[in-house]
Amino acid sequence: MKRLTTLMLSLTLMLSAQAQQRTNGYPISQVPFTAVKITPNTFWGDRIYAAREVTIPLAFSKCEETHRYENFNMAAYTLQHPGHEGLKTPQWDVSKFMGFSFDDTDVYKTIEGASYVLQTYPDKKLTAYIDSVLDIVGAAQEPDGYLYTARTINPEHPHHWAGKKRWEVEEILSHELYNLGHMVDAACAHYQATGSDKFLNIAKRYADCVIKEVGSKEGQACVVPGHQIAEMALARLYVLTGEQKYLDEAKFLLDYRGKTGRRDIYSQSDKPVVDQKEAWGHAVRAGYMYAGMADVAALTGDEGYLKAIDAIYNNIVSKKYYITGGVGARHAGEAFGADYELPNLTSYNETCAAISMVYLFQRMFLLHGDSKYIDCMERTLYNGVISGMSVDGGRFFYPNPLASDGKYAFNADNTVERQPWFGCACCPSNLCRFIPSFPGYMYAVKDRDLYVNLFAGNTATIKIGGKDVILEQITNYPWDGDIALTIKKNQAKAFNLKIRVPGWVDRSPVPSDLYRFSDDVLGNYSIKVNGQVVKTEMANGFFVIKRLWKKGDVVSIHFDMPVRTVKANPAVVDDRGRIAVERGPLVYCAEGIDNQDFNIFNFLMPRQPRFEVNDLQINGNRQVTFNVKAIQVEGQFVNTDEKGEISATHRRLTMIPYYAWNHRGPGLMEVWMPQSISALGNY
C-alpha cells in the first residue's frame, strides 16, 4: 500500500509539472525562486537574512499581538458552535476588535515570505510553526470553502465593511476576493517551497467556492474585485495545477470589470480593461490588475489585453514614473496623478505600489524579451522597494517621498520617520513576502537562451532543454560593476548566454523621454570569456554569447559605474531647474544629518559638478549600522538675510543612496537638487 501511495504521489507531481510546462503561457520562462540560492553576506543576501531574522518574526509576532490569529480561532469556534451565546455580546462584535476586513491577509503574506525564506535558510522550527498556523487557518474555513473571518466570526454582526451577505459589497469594501488572492499566492509559494499541499488545499477550496458563487451565470454574484490581486493569483493557481477553471475565473474577473454595478477610476472599473490606455486610480490595485492582465494575456493569447497593458506600461514610464521607480503621486486615493504630476515633498509612492510595478515589469519582459523592462524593474527594486524597509528589516515606510522637511507627516499613522508597524499593515507584510522572493527575478529561459537579468551573488541550477546548468555569480553589485559568472556544471552543452547591459550603462535612465542624462559621461562596459574578448551581438539590450560551454568557463563582466546626473522632462513642473544624482542602479539623496552646517534645500548644484565617491558608515538609531558608497560634491549654499540680500558660500554636500535615508531620525532630505536660483526652496 505504501509503495502504491508513493507511486501515485510521484505520478501526481509529474502530471503537475507537465501541466505547468504545457500552460506556462509566456514566451520566456522565469527561473523559479526554488532554483536560485542567494549568497549570504551580499547586498541581497543581507536583505533576505534581515527578512528571516527580523521582518518575518516581527510580522508573525504582530499577527499574535493584533488579534490576527485570534480571528481565525473565533471563526473556528463559531463554526463548531453555531449560534453560541457569545455572538450576542460586545466581545464578539467584529468591528470592535478587527481593524480591517483584510486583516487575514497579513497572516497569508507572512507565510508566503517565510516559505521563500525556507529555500535559502531551511528551518524545521519555522516549518513547524507555519504548519501550526495553517491548522488554525484551516479550522476557520466554512464547509463550502468560504474563508473570511470578518464574516464567519459573527455572521449576524460581521465587520462593518463586510456587508450583510457574501459578495454584497465586494466591489466597495469587503475585500473577500483580495483575501482569496493573497491566500492563493501564499499557498502556491508554500507548496513550491515545502512540497506540502496543506495550504494549497485550503486555498483551492476557497477558490472553488468563489468559482461556484461569483460569475455571470444566473444565481451567481456578478461582481469583480474591489481590490485586485485575485486575478494574477488564480492564474498562478492554474499554472500550478493545470485546472482550467481557475484561469477561466481569472479572466471573468478581468472581462467584467467596467461592466458591473461599480464604475469608477479609483478601482480601474470606469471602463472595460481592454479600453484602458492610461494608469489611473489606486496605484496598488492598478499594478496588481495590470500584472494579472499580463498573466491572462500570456495564457489565453488575448490581443486586447496585450494592447492595453502595452499602452498602460508606456503611459507609466513616460509620464507617471518617479526617478526612484515608485508610482502613485497622490496621497488622496493613494493614486496615480495626471501626466507629469510628480511632486516630491507630497509624493505618495506607496511601497506596495512599487512591488506591484516589479510584478508588472517582470511580466512585460517575459512577454516581449526586451531589457528595458528589466531596467525599470531594477530601478524600482533598488530604490522604490527597498526604501520601504530599514536595512535591519525592523522599521517601515508606507509612502516614499522624494523630499522631506522633517515636519510634513508623510508616513502612515501621521509620522515622519520609519515605524515598526502600522494599523493598516499591508506594506510591512508585503515586504515580508516580496524581499525573500527576489531570487525568482534573477534569471529567465527561452529554449536555449539563458537570460541573466539581475546581478547579485548567487548559485542557480537552471534547466535548459531539460538539462541542468549550474551557474555561480560573484559580485559586489550595486557598489561596483564587476561580475563573475562561472559555469559550475553544464549538461546542456551549447546554449546562448544573454547578459543584460543596464540602460544606465550606455543608454538612458528610463526607456522614455521622462528622464535623460544631463552630463557628457560616456558609459562603457566589457564582457570576456576566460579572459578573452568574444565575438558577439547585441539583441534587445542583451549581450549574447553563443557557445559550447564547459565546466569552469568564467564570464567576466565590467560595467563602468560613474556618478551621473539626470534631468526630468520640462513638463514635470516640480523638477524644473533641478538634477538627480545616480550611480549604477542607485538613486542618491542629500540628508540633513550629513550636512548639518547648512540647509540642503538651499544648496545649489554647479552646472558641471565634480563628484567623489567614498565609503561611509551609517550609524542609525536602534543599533542599526551599515556601510554605503557616499557621494560628495562642491557647490554653493545660498542664503538670504533679514534685509533680503542674497549671499553664497562654498559648501561640500554629502549624498547617500535613497534607500538609506531616515535611519537616523527625521530631518531634511532631497533627491532633486536645485541647479538654478529659481528652484531653491520651492517646496
Segments predicted by a language model, with ranges:
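Aromatic-lined substrate-binding rim segments of carbohydrate-active enzymes
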Residues: 125-141
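Short, charged, amphipathic alpha-helices and their helix-cap/turn boundaries
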Residues: 156-162, 197-212, 268
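C-terminal beta-rich recognition modules with glycine/proline-rich loops and embedded aromatic residues
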Residues: 309, 375-383, 388-486, 506-529, ...
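Aromatic (Trp/Tyr) and acidic
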Residues: 21-124, 128, 158-193, 228-245, ...
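Flexible glycine/proline-rich, aromatic-decorated loop/lid segments
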Residues: 264-266, 320-339
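Bacterial Sec-dependent N-terminal signal peptides
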Residues: 1-21
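Helix-capping and short linker residues that terminate individual alpha-solenoid repeat units
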Residues: 122, 138-142, 195, 211-215, ...
